[in-house]
Amino acid sequence: MTTDHAAPPALRSSAGARSAGLRYGALFGPSVFGVTAAGVALPDVATALHATPSAAAWVLTAHALALGVGTALFGRLADSRSIRSSLLLGSLVLATGTIVCLTAPNIGTLVAGRFILATGSGAMTSGALALSASSAPEERSKILSGFGATIAVFSAGATLAGGVFTHWLTWRLTLVLPALSLLAVPLCLRAAARLGSGRPLDLTGAAMLTVAAMSFLLLIQTYALGLPVAAVIGLAITLTLSIGGLIWRVRSSENSFVPRSLLSDRAFRRAAVTGIGVYAGLFAAMYAVPQILVREHHWTVLAVGAGLLPGAVVGAVLSRTAGRLTGGYGASRLLSGIAAAMVVALVASAATTNAASLVIAASLGFAAFAVTQVITTALMSARIDPARRGGALGLLNLTFFVGGGVGSAIAGALVKSMDLTKILGIVAVFPLVAALAALTLGKLSR
């Protein structure tokens, strides 16, 4: 897999590389609200719609899964047709999901609306990643610096935004905050005009991958959801069949949704492991930390959001630094150091239940999230042919989001048998894996 071809002129921003990075970050950033901000609203959702806690949890689970699938699917659409087509169709899907969520009369309709909304939000994330990856090599580091700084601000401010909208307005607005990406779409269309390759989309493969991911997440939450034995067996069979079908699809088709050449790329596999560790640690922390601060330290939701805001500053600075360090060992060592520091903070939180260590752990998770996007986008952009970058980055981010779903699902399953603070010590294994895997990325990026 090669390449570092210069981007077509149509993809270069006339307003400068840093401005382009900010616009692409504004396109991607609101997707973060779909999980972290929405989590703040779950108690109000359950009360208003008379839903059980396990049913309300699907407001987050369905969103995380659909966001990953949408990112991969619209990434392939961008490669096949154009980034512009992907953004326009995704905008329609995102707007439709927003309307469904705002008018949903019950929890089932709301979950369906969130699935639609997240699928459209996936078009925004894949578009932002594809635009960043398609920039000229000499501009890419500056674009990625601005991109990473912007999404760091969104990620750290998500809980505060969720608290403000839920407390002062309505939980329904909190659940549709990802629709803010629509405001950035017109600012990115000019750069998204390049035509795609025209290769067909493998919708069958996409469906198999979606079913496999959903079955896997449901199996992890078997205990928490109280699923009967028959349902568990059915899910296990579905997972086995969908994985088997996907493997057959990969081996039998050159245009499969998951390209064989991508799976054989060491850089892709190592980047996936790194991102899964970071996202799983962050999602698990965002499940537990706000609840601990509210229940045990008696913080208000607004105080939790405000306390996590410094993470925006840390993440913005570190992601800009990572953007300048791409192409060598510096960026991978930076990410490894951040992930390792998160491990220490999570273990300290489990041991002491100190509020400061809880805030630091979550803030480091935000920083690792932003830096991971910068490093993995730069790494894959230099190795993947431009005509396949959108799909490759979409699939990579699908693994990240499924990893995040695994982290929150494990934390949710363990909460029935142990304290939230103890859970933090267990989920620290995720950023530990990321810290070790990140060290292997530097050699691949040279």
What are these regions (language model features)?
Residues 1-16:
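Short, Lys/Arg-rich, polar N-terminal cytosolic tail immediately upstream
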Residues 115-151:
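Cytoplasmic helix-loop-helix junction between adjacent transmembrane helices
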Residues 16-79, 84-97, 110, 119-120, ...:
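12-transmembrane solute porter fold
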Residues 87, 140-151, 198-208, 263, ...:
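Cytoplasmic-side transmembrane-helix entry/capping segments in multi-pass membrane proteins
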Residues 163, 167-273:
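Hydrophobic transmembrane-helix bundles of small-molecule transporters
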Residues 99-100, 160, 164, 218, ...:
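Alpha-helical transmembrane segments of multipass membrane proteins
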Residues 145-159, 399-407:
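Glycine-rich segments within core transmembrane alpha-helices of 12-TM secondary carriers
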Residues 99-103, 186-191, 244-247, 347-351, ...:
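Membrane-embedded alpha-helical segments of multi-pass transporters/permeases
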